[in-house]
């Protein structure tokens, strides 16, 4: 089905003007501005539950693990409508942490099965009411995916004029902020055993896309206005990752950081020129890099991975500033907040480390499983577990839990924060938590 407006009714300019709200900061893409997971807003909520402190709970048109973004007065979410048939993929495997004997992970495939639709929905950030909806049929080869997610894993991104939504089969669409299609591309077929997880990134009008797949990996930049190719860089064979490229400001110019298996790479975001790299035996990283106070931090691989700290500005092969062995997170990206690093993992442990050395400041077992990346603001750190517990910690060199809030849903997507409110995306539902709207 082609794109359309909610309820089949075109949104009027009067309604659109009424939706505008001044003073709320956008959360325009994966982990917000700069992919940092940070907000400068104050008065963020501390305590809530399914019956208290929840501004709205809205059903989505489908399921997915992409995170919500906030653009103006819109909260925008992508979904897959329709389900994969759950059959083993080509290489089912037991992924096991020797300390915890973690449960088996499975890739699933759907060569047949029912028709799927890829959906982009926009909701009012005040009340959660649907403003518009765009749908397109999922075409081409259906790739294998991890059983925890589907084709709606990449988080959309917006430049304030357009929304770019990318899906795990390679389909990409640019929409205006009224839900009308501007251009569309199909970059498939995709081939990545656990499914595509990288989100699009923006740089000075360019849309940057990482396709670290077998048999060949590449990095691609498109003109945001038209979808035309600006540059493409082949990254070789056998490189697989699920991380999102992150732009950092280096002493010799901007750099695009790609956390991938085999090594970390830095590119010139305007041209795709490879600037520097650092080798590693770690495989298939999911977390994205984070850049703060002139240093790049990243978790380097699968379970029990290393943490690296690196400085931008190098050329050729470089070495990390420091490494912390076996302390990294499996899926969530690192949070750097007020001079400390925060990391969560799939066995319910949160670790706080010193930014200068990587030395552990404190470690606390909260329980649960963490796949969502942490966010922070207003002196607080927010950690969302898969089973719907949001732990609110006081930021600092001592572990202090301010609240444990439960919503009774399954959460794999990372939160978005805007206007004093936290937006949480469950499997098929969107929550707005907190009452402040600015």
Predicted regions and their residues:
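Generic alpha-helical secondary structure signal
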Residues: 8-9, 20, 427
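Noncatalytic, solvent-exposed loop/strand surfaces
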Residues: 23-438
């Amino acid at each position: 089905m082609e794109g359309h407006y909610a309820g089949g009714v075109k949104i009027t300019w009067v309604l659109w003007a009424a939706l505008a709200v001044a003073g709320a900061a956008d959360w325009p893409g994966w982990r917000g501005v700069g992919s940092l997971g940070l907000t400068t807003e104050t008065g963020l909520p501390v305590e809530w539950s399914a019956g208290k402190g929840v501004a709205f709970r809205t059903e989505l048109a489908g399921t997915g693990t992409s995170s919500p973004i906030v653009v103006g007065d819109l909260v925008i979410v992508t979904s897959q409508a329709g389900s994969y048939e759950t059959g083993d993929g080509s290489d089912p495997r037991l992924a096991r942490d020797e300390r915890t004997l973690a449960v088996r992970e499975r890739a699933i495939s759907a060569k047949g099965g029912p028709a799927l639709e890829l959906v982009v929905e926009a909701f009012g950030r005040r009340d959660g009411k649907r403003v518009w909806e765009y749908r397109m049929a999922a075409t081409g080869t259906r790739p294998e995916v991890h059983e925890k997610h589907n084709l709606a894993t990449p988080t959309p991104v917006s430049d304030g004029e357009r929304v770019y939504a990318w899906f795990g089969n390679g389909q990409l669409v640019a929409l205006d902020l009224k839900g009308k299609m501007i251009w569309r591309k199909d970059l498939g077929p995709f081939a990545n055993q656990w499914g595509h997880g990288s989100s699009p990134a923006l740089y000075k009008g360019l849309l940057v896309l990482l396709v670290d797949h077998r048999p060949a990996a590449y990095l691609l930049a498109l003109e945001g206005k038209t979808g035309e190719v600006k540059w493409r860089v082949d990254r070789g064979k056998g490189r697989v990752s699920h991380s999102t490229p992150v732009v950092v400001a280096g002493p010799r110019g901007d750099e695009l950081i790609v956390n991938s298996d085999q090594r970390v790479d830095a590119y010139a975001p305007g041209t795709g020129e490879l600037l520097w790299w650092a080798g590693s035996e770690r495989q298939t990283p999911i977390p994205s890099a984070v850049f703060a106070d002139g240093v790049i931090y990243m978790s380097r691989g699968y379970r029990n991975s290393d943490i690296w700290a690196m400085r931008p500005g190098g050329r050729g092969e470089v070495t990390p500033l420091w490494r912390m062995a076996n302390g990294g997170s499996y899926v969530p990206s690192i949070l750097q907040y007020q001079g400390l690093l925060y990391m969560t993992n799939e066995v319910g442990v949160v670790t706080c480390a010193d930014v200068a050395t990587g030395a552990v400041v404190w470690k606390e077992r909260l329980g649960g499983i963490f796949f969502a990346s942490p966010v922070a603001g207003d002196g607080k750190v927010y950690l969302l577990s898969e089973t719907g517990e949001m732990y609110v910690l006081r930021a600092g060199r001592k572990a202090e839990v301010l609240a444990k809030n439960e919503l009774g849903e399954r959460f794999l997507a990372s939160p978005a924060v805007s206007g004093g409110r936290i937006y949480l995306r469950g499997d098929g539902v969107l929550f707005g938590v907190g009452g402040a709207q600015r």
